[in-house]
From Swiss-Prot:
Annotated source species: Acanthamoeba polyphaga mimivirus
Top-level taxon of the source organism: Viruses
Protein's recorded name: Uncharacterized protein L719
Gene3D superfamilies attached to this UniProt entry: Hepatocyte Growth Factor (3.50.4.10)
Amino acid sequence: MMYNSGNNSRDKLKLLDHLNQMIASHRNSQSSGTNQVYVDDKPITANRFNNAINISGAVITNREPYYASGVPTTVHRTESVFSPQSTNVVPFNGVPIIRGSTVMNNMDCIGSNYNDFKVNGMGSCRNACIADNKCLTWSFDKRNQHCYLKDSASVSCNSNDAYTSGRIQSTFQPTHNVTPVPIHSSSIPTSMPIQLAPRPPTQSVPVQTIPIQTQIPQPPRNPVQPPMSPVQPPISPVQPPISPVQPPISPVPSTPSIKRISTMIPNYIHQEVLGPNRSLNVDSSNACQTACINDDRCASWNFLPQMQDNKNFDRCLLYYGQPTLIGPARGGSHGKIYNQLPY
C-alpha cells in the first residue's frame, strides 16, 4: 500500500507540473513571446519590428482608444481645405471631398430646418448649403426669396411650384492628381550615361586581339580589325532616343485645376470669428468677394454695412478660418469659399 501511495504522489506532482507549464505557456503567448501587443487581453496591432514587448508590469494610465497609423480611404466626413485650426475639420488623406448639389425644380422638402435667411436667388441658397458641412438638403422659397438649410438628407419632398430644392452629393478628386509627375523624369539623367558610354566595346576588343596574336600569324590581323568599325556606329542610334524620353515631362498641365467659388449672403455677416487676417477698403460686396477668391488662403469674408459717422474705413474683411455663426446686418453681406472641379 505504501508503494502504491508513493506512485500516486509522483503522478500528482507530474500532473501539477504539466499544468503549470501549460499556464506559463499561455501567459507568455499573450505577453512578450509573440509579435502581438495585448492590452486588457485584447490584441491591438501586429508588432512588425519583431521585437519582444512585455507589458505585464506596465501601469496603464490612459484608457483612451488606441489608434494605428492610417485611415481607410472610404472614411470621409468633411474636407480639410482652408485652415487646420478649425475645430470641425478632419484630415482627408490626400483626397479632398468636392461637395455638390442637385436641383429639383417645383419641389419643397419639408422639415429638419436649422437655419433660414433671405438670399438674392436660388443659386445663393444652393451655394450656402454647399459651403456649410452641416447642410444636407436645402429649399428656396421663390415668393419671398427665403432660403432654408436642413441637416437631414431623408426629408420628404413634395411638389410645390413656389419652391426649388436640392440635396448635397459628395464626390472625390481623382487619385491620379495626387501622384507627382516629376518623379518619373528624375530617373532619365541617371539612365543616359549608361546608354552613351562606349567603354564596354573598347575593353572587349583588346581581349580578342591577345589570343589572335599568340595563335594566328600577323597576316590575319586585317580581318580582325574590321569588326571595330561596326562596334562604334551603335553610338549614333543610342543618342536619338534622348528626344522621345523628354516629352513625357510636358503632360503636367493635364491635371485638372480646382476652381474657387464663393457664396454671397446679403444682410448677414459672420460673427465670433478670429481675425480678420486682411482688411480692404472697397465699395461693394462683389469686390470683397473677388478679393477673397483671389487670395488662396482666404476661407470666408465679411462686407460691413456703411457707417454714417465714419465713411473712410475698411469694409471688406478677409478671414483665413471658417466662422460658425452669422448674424443680421442690414446693408452688409458675407460669404464662404468652397472648391469645385471643372465639369
